[in-house]
Swiss-Prot record:
GO terms for biological process: cell division; cell wall organization; peptidoglycan biosynthetic process; regulation of cell shape. It is an enzyme of class 6 (ligase). Keywords: ATP-binding, Cell cycle, Cell division, Cell shape, Cell wall biogenesis/degradation, Cytoplasm, Ligase, Nucleotide-binding, Peptidoglycan synthesis. This is UDP-N-acetylmuramoylalanine--D-glutamate ligase. One of its GO terms (molecular function) is ATP binding. ATP binds at G117, T118, N119, G120, K121, T122, T123. Its EC number is 6.3.2.9. The gene is murD. It catalyses: UDP-N-acetyl-alpha-D-muramoyl-L-alanine + D-glutamate + ATP = UDP-N-acetyl-alpha-D-muramoyl-L-alanyl-D-glutamate + ADP + phosphate + H(+).
Length: 454
């Protein structure tokens, strides 16, 4: 892809913006950066690019006539909605508009494995990456996991494996992006404030399969009825995984073991009790990872070893500490109700739950109903605090306390905890009302817990 002397507009200067601009400059493009944030808020990012000749248009989206030269390409950061008037006007002029993973795909070489879904993406992406690394493959783990795909694209070679965690925001802007193996782990309502409807959200997720050919592989959760029905339209070869059903072909659980059945030949992978990371949600992640890596020829011994040793990822049911018999678990990655339900299901001790955060328009009925006698008390904070309280009381869960912030929630939970209890941060909400991302929220939780020991 020749971008030398091409005029490229980057809209959105968030996490992917810096590596994106660096690569575009490296390729000789004339780069214009536009962000609705003002210069004051972006100074630190701009310092990192001070050696590059970049034109900035900050504090607003401009009129097209204000641009100094005709545009050859527009690259939109994932956090920028594609239906804002500025982007609509650019599209109406016939200018190509793509996202960061589309650009990275056009520049990269190698075997692409892409993973999406509402929950489990980060754990599964990390696990798949670890399996390929243990198999001796040069592996890049990128995407919505904290390392922009574009930052590694020019380093890749034809033999590399690129494992991508792909969000709905990233997938809605693809054009040619085609993974050799694509997977949807599950699908429940999320990000409806951005996508407006469940249909739009689902369509964005299914974009992961839209360019696949008959020789490519689509890995799908058989237990998700909606996914199973919609998968009939997929052109790629389908490989199902299931925690609940004995499949005629695919990867599933039989007699407490993960098995793979293909062309009448059954292979035993591992006992589910030997998987290091606990919980049914992690069993599903292990099934998906097994299906994906087997599809690309990884030996069973390597998969088995990795499932026995992989310790999970930070901020996902991460045990932080045990203080005077009270366990503290950081599940800050629980950014929607379904993710937090899975977090609660994986804990077998009485729970003091901390929930709340940015309002994505979620419904919390199923979340509250999932307490199932496990949750002794819930502390709520953030934009969704009142909604959570009202939903809990409507469903006859009355042990709820509203607090101002995470610090107060942790301290009050610890005050009433007894030996054998678990203080669980699993917010069921995004972090953006108080924190830049869920990682910062999780790190703050761990700092608060550490201070309890002092």
């Amino acid at each position: 892809m020749n971008l030398k002397e091409k005029n490229v507009l980057v809209i959105g200067f968030a996490v992917t913006g810096i590596p994106l601009v660096k690569v575009l400059c490296q390729l000789g493009a004339n780069v214009i950066v536009n962000d609705s944030k003002k210069e004051e808020a972006l100074k630190e990012s701009m310092k990192l690019l001070s050696d590059h000749p970049i034109q900035y248009i900050l504090g607003k989206h401009p009129e097209i006539e204000e641009l100094s030269a005709p545009l050859d390409l527009v690259v939109v950061s994932p956090g920028v909605p594609l239906d804002i008037p500025f982007i609509e006007n650019l599209r109406a002029r016939g200018i190509e508009i793509i996202g960061e993973i589309e650009l990275a795909y056009r520049l990269a070489q190698g075997h692409i494995v892409a993973i999406t879904g509402t929950n489990g993406k980060t754990t599964t992406t990390s696990l798949v990456g670890e399996i390929f690394k243990n198999a001796g493959r040069r592996t890049h783990v990128v995407g919505n996991i904290g390392v922009a795909f574009i930052s590694k694209a020019l380093e890749t070679t034809a033999d590399d494996v690129i494992v991508i965690e792909a969000s709905s925001f990233q997938l809605e802007s693809i054009v040619d992006f085609r993974p050799q193996v694509g997977a949807i782990l599950n699908l429940t309502p999320d990000h409806l404030n951005r996508h407006k409807t469940m249909e739009n959200y689902q369509k964005a997720k299914f974009n992961i399969f839209k360019n696949q050919g008959a020789e490519d592989i689509a890995v799908i959760n058989y237990d998700d009825v909606k996914l199973r029905e919609e998968s009939k339209q997929i052109y790629a070869k389908k490989v199902y995984f299931s925690r609940r059903t004995l499949l005629e072909e695919g990867v599933f659980v039989e007699d407490g073991k993960i098995v793979a059945l293909k062309d009448g030949h059954k292979k035993e992978i591992i006992s589910k009790d030997d998987i290091f990371i606990p919980g049914n949600h992690n069993l599903e992640n292990a099934l998906a990872a097994t299906a994906m890596t087997l599809s690309l020829g990884v030996d069973i011994d390597v998969i088995q070893h990795t499932l026995k040793t992989f310790k999970g990822v930070e901020h996902r049911t991460e045990i932080v500490d045990v203080i005077h018999g009270v366990r503290f678990i950081n599940d800050s990655k629980g950014t929607n109700p379904d993710a937090s339900i899975k977090g609660i299901e994986g804990i077998n001790t009485p729970i003091l739950l901390i929930a709340g955060g940015y309002d994505k328009g979620s419904d919390f009925d199923e979340f509250i109903n999932a307490f199932d006698g496990k949750v002794k008390h819930m502390f709520v904070y953030g934009e969704t605090a009142n909604t959570l309280m009202e939903t809990a009381k409507k469903l006859n869960f009355i042990d709820v306390t509203k607090v101002q912030n995470l610090d107060e929630a942790v301290k009050k939970a610890y005050d009433i905890a007894i030996q054998g209890d678990t203080v669980l941060l699993s917010p069921a909400c995004a972090s953006w009302d108080m924190y830049e991302n869920f990682e910062m929220r999780g790190k703050h939780f761990k700092e608060i817990v550490a201070n309890l020991r002092r």
